[in-house]
Amino acid sequence: MSFSHLGLSDKVIAAVAASGYKAPTPIQDQAIPHVLARRDVLGIAQTGTGKTAAFTLPMLTMLEKGRARARMPRTLILEPTRELAAQVEESFAKYGANHKLNVALIIGGVSFDDQDQKLMRGVDVLIATPGRLLDHFERGRLLLSGVELLVIDEADRMLDMGFIPDIERICKLVPFTRQTLFFTATMPAEIRRITEQFLSNPVRVEVARPATTVATTTQLLARSGREPHDKRDTLRRLIRSAEGLKNAIIFCNRKRDVATLFRSLQRHGFSAQALHGDMDQSARTAALEQFRKGEVTLLVASDVAARGLDIPDVSHIYNFDVPIHADDYVHRIGRTGRAGRSGTAITIVAGSNDAKA
């Protein structure tokens, strides 16, 4: 099986080959022909299944005809976080290497003026977080009446983050004749309601969920006292005694705990950075680059901020808080033990907690 049978253009197939990919993933194989046939698609798939290319590749093929007009994007992709939006932009840069398309990223933490200039030039692909998109719309800087295709990605995370009212508003602002691609890892009742309201006779594409953890990751539990300072002390002892610790991501359930733990680790002499939703974009980008380059050893993060991040070689994961959802546990520890490397994931369980995973 290869990409050539999916109906993609020669330019796209050449870019995929240049990127080193030879065969489509199941979500790509199932979704791409329906996208090219202009059908609405409901894709149930998690991050890591190749779903981003399942919409970027056919979009590139479809956008080879036509031109963008000022302030009127031809296609719109909604992402829950700035980092996911930036990664989709990178996907268009990689697979669109043979195209001359204007792609704009509209996210918080970046100057309105810079984004406004991009919109004025005309945009083929607009990738945005819901809040910043509506900010531009309300300022009169953006018209959504020319959107031919709408992608709503990570819809269940949108629900977790309280974005569903924004999503509903945006769906009503774009033409009802547009094509809609809707991706979610789970289908709670509220998400099902949204799909029934805004998708037209969609093709449902579902791939098996990678709901198991990899064999190359050692999973451990560590008991601690109930108080936050007890957990911080336990974490410090675990880090100091860890064998082969190259770097580590430490997960907290709440962004305020991310900031508190980060400051505590720094006070105790650890090389650490934080990643949470209240940081502006430049600070988040700088934190990630420091971690990727090995300039800091520890990255303290929330689930939402770390969703979809591509950091290939992480030796240790620490769950400072027991994750609320089992899926979050799988996502968290999936950051280590990649590509055949060994990894270690340790969950700290306070006296009053029960491990959920």
Each model region followed by its residue ranges:
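Conserved helicase RecA-like core
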Residues: 2-357
